[in-house]
Amino acid sequence: MNKRSLRVLEFNKVKEMLKKYAYSSSAKKLVDELVPYDNTYEINNRLEESNEALEILMKKGNPPIEGLCDIGDILQRAKKGGTLTPEQLLKVLGMLTATRRMQEFFKREDQEVSFPKLEDLAYILAPINDLEKEIERSILSEDEVSDNASTTLYNIRRSLKEKNSSVREKINSIVRSNSKYLQDSLYTIRGDRYVIPVKAEYKSSVPGLVHDQSSTGATLFIEPMGLVNLNNEIKELMLKEKAEIDRVLSALSLKVKMNAEHCESNFKILTNLDFIFSKGKYACELNAIKPMVRDDGIFNIMSGRHPLIEKDKVVPLDVVLGDEFDTLMITGPNTGGKTVTLKTVGLLHIMALSGLLIPASSNSSVSFFKEVFADIGDEQSIEQSLSTFSSHLTNIVNIMEYDNRQSLILFDELGGGTDPAEGAALAIAIIENLSSKGAKLIATTHYSELKAYALNKERVENASVEFDINTLRPTYRLLIGVPGKSNAFEISKRIGLGKEVIDCAKNYMSKENLEFEGLIRNLQEKSIIAKKDARDAKVIKDEADNLKKKYEQKLERLEKVKDKAYMDAREEAKKIVANAKDEADEILKAMRELEKLGIGSGGRQRLEEERKKLKDSLEEKEKNLYKMKENDGEVLEKVALGMEAFLPSLNQTVVVISMPDNRGEVQVEAGIMKISVKLKDLRKTKQSKVEKVKKKRELKLHFSKVENRIDLRGLDAEEACYRVDKYLDDAYMGNLGEVTIVHGKGTGILRKAINDMLKRHVHVKNYRLGGYGEGGDGATIVELK
């Protein structure tokens, strides 16, 4: 896309705002390089990533990107065999830690909402835990290696501490015994060796090696001979320490080199995630949405807001183009918001085509344009010089030379800066030329000729910015279908210009112009009233919709509570009966034991009578659990798929979804529940034969429409399993032998959830992953019973 439009529409300022939300310098660099994409596939992918980032930020908070630094040069140094400094290794550690934490951040439970785009990115991350732990253990700060880096280093430093302690004890003794020869009763260090400050005149009184002297020459820093050997030992240990540190750093650098490819890949993915989340954070700040992207030149921006205008000052605008008209002519007074409208439309398109969410309402759409041209001056002046006219015309000529079949062109004061009649004629000619090439245009103007042109020309529409005559201020609302007027007479009257002067001015205007201006004013007033009525109606409708939704949800919750309470009561009753049966069996068992111990045949017969009486009583109690509230109805002897029946135990009508098995049980559907019951427990309904036949025909027709393939991509596991369960029931009743379930490859979570459900499903005979030409690992082939 041309750089001039990006500059004029202030896309660079948007990117500067976006950079504030990027953590790493590498992500900020991606922001600097951001330009509109050249195909809808890329645009939709980038918009979906931004939208997922926004949703994640709202649900889970900020991702763990802290500590990520640009390590490109560091990895190149390691790959060439160079030794990394502790500071460089800490930067590598920051990336490794961010890699591990980011992957943990994206882990979720099966029931949680999925974010496939970003989860796929995080899935590619390859944590290098061993290297992370080793650097963390070895490097203490940007300039210090830890004692724990190696056993050798630990031992060397322990010896150093011991030697230093011995030297300090000895030198303190020397200071005390030679205090009269010393400048101060203390010791110091010169060149890593312990020395004492001796007065120059007593140099011969303290035998030792001179290492330094004061600036005046009055003090000599002498290493006493008694310390030379100890100082030599300390120096040797310090050299060993340095050598061991170099070895540790070299070993760590080698391990970084060995893992350089994984580090580079992780760094690239983390940078991309940092960039994507910066877009999500900016969208959160703007209260932005993901627009639909069309490729037919039609767009509908609803409540669009300019992202660079302060929230409390920006006025939302509605702009449509490409459906009923291809050119929009905006007229109205200066400072009325015409130029802001142009810039808002252009900038929101550039943002969306660059993968950024836009500040607008959720039902907004943009269109894919290969080019967005903007001829917008930096200054809005009443007087325009010839040089300004020439500059605008030069830019227009460049625009007209381009193939504008997929272009959005924005003109500010088209034809301005020259004679009004010539300027208007030139503007009309330019519009017609560009329209004939398929371009979509929005232009602002003051010329009445262009208002009349828009009224009479097909595919061209007038628009104006609303102006409040009472306050003499623009409202900045865009009124499509209504041409604007300058309001010069009304403004002059409000300011205090005499009536006679205004009347005189009107006499110089033609009758046609006065009538035209009056017509425009009437249209504006009616449009304003209509807009207000529409806004009021929308508020009432939204309130009604919310109220309806609220009570529907409340009713649904009540139904669920009622069903659950009923089922809980039945389960509790069944448990009571079962416990009673168990207790009876225990009693009978005990009675048989007593019989073995000596009860005669007469007692045996009585025991059997009591046993039968107890069993009969329990069975009667169990039957009472399943009695209907009203008449039980006639017992069903035969059933058919799709037949309605009455189930007394639930006191409701159910639908038969399977034929009786070898145990005499059928599966029925009761609302959202599927349960197995005995055929003898079902009762005929009071439905007429005609209604039954009609129902069967409707059912058969419904099942005949069942397709042999269902696509679940984009759904979460819970929703997907629900749809598959219902789909398999329909497919089974539609006599489909084999069906295909498309779940995509992704992270494999959805496929696992589907497979777990298929293992338990009553209609599934067998299932397998798709083969070549069947969708591969992204699909599962299911054979039905």
UniProtKB/Swiss-Prot annotation:
Annotated TM spans: none
Job description of the protein: Endonuclease that is involved in the suppression of homologous recombination and thus may have a key role in the control of bacterial genetic diversity.
InterPro entries in UniProt: DNA_mismatch_repair_MutS_C (IPR000432), DNA_mismatch_repair_MutS_core (IPR007696), DNA_mismatch_repair_MutS_sf (IPR036187), MSSS (IPR046893), MutS (IPR045076), MutS2 (IPR005747), P-loop_NTPase (IPR027417), Smr_dom (IPR002625)
GO MF term (any one): ATP binding
Naturally occurring in which organism (per UniProt): Clostridium botulinum (strain Alaska E43 / Type E3)
Protein name: Endonuclease MutS2
Keywords (A to Z) from UniProt: ATP-binding, DNA-binding, Endonuclease, Hydrolase, Nuclease, Nucleotide-binding, RNA-binding, rRNA-binding
Protein's GO biological process: mismatch repair; negative regulation of DNA recombination; rescue of stalled ribosome
One Pfam family recorded for the sequence: MSSS
CDD domains for this protein: ABC_MutS2, ATP-synt_Fo_b
Keyword Transit peptide: no
UniProt record similarity statement: Belongs to the DNA mismatch repair MutS family. MutS2 subfamily.
Positions bound to ATP: 332-339
Subunit composition and interactions: Homodimer. Binds to stalled ribosomes, contacting rRNA.
Documented EC number(s): 3.1.-.-, 3.6.4.-
Keyword ATP-binding found: yes
Domain named Smr: residues: 710-785
